[in-house]
Amino acid sequence: APGNKAECEREKGYCGFLKCSFPFVVSGKCSRFFFCCKNIW
């Protein structure tokens, strides 16, 4: 799972504050309060 913003974006994800919006799910971490969100489709 991604552990920072660069890794998250490389995996075509984005950093969401505390949660992710559908259809994205938490799939890692960007920083303390930001989670890496990835599309489930």
Curated annotation (Swiss-Prot):
<keyword id="KW-0929">Antimicrobial</keyword>
<dbReference type="Pfam" id="PF00711">
    <property type="entry name" value="Defensin_beta"/>
</dbReference>
<feature type="disulfide bond">
    <location>
        <begin position="8"/>
        <end position="36"/>
    </location>
</feature>
<comment type="function">
    <text>Has antibacterial activity against the Gram-positive bacterium S.aureus 1056 MRSA (MIC=1.25 ug/ml) and the Gram-negative bacterium E.coli O157:H7 (MIC=0.96 ug/ml). Has antifungal activity against the yeast C.albicans 3153A (MIC=6.20 ug/ml).</text>
</comment>
<keyword id="KW-0211">Defensin</keyword>
<keyword id="KW-0044">Antibiotic</keyword>
<protein>
    <recommendedName>
        <fullName>Ostricacin-2</fullName>
    </recommendedName>
</protein>
<keyword id="KW-1015">Disulfide bond</keyword>
<dbReference type="GO" id="GO:0050832">
    <property type="term" value="P:defense response to fungus"/>
</dbReference>
<dbReference type="GO" id="GO:0042742">
    <property type="term" value="P:defense response to bacterium"/>
</dbReference>
<dbReference type="InterPro" id="IPR001855">
    <property type="entry name" value="Defensin_beta-like"/>
</dbReference>
<keyword id="KW-0964">Secreted</keyword>
<dbReference type="GO" id="GO:0005576">
    <property type="term" value="C:extracellular region"/>
</dbReference>
<comment type="similarity">
    <text>Belongs to the beta-defensin family.</text>
</comment>
<keyword id="KW-0295">Fungicide</keyword>
<dbReference type="GO" id="GO:0031640">
    <property type="term" value="P:killing of cells of another organism"/>
</dbReference>
<feature type="disulfide bond">
    <location>
        <begin position="20"/>
        <end position="37"/>
    </location>
</feature>
<feature type="disulfide bond">
    <location>
        <begin position="15"/>
        <end position="30"/>
    </location>
</feature>
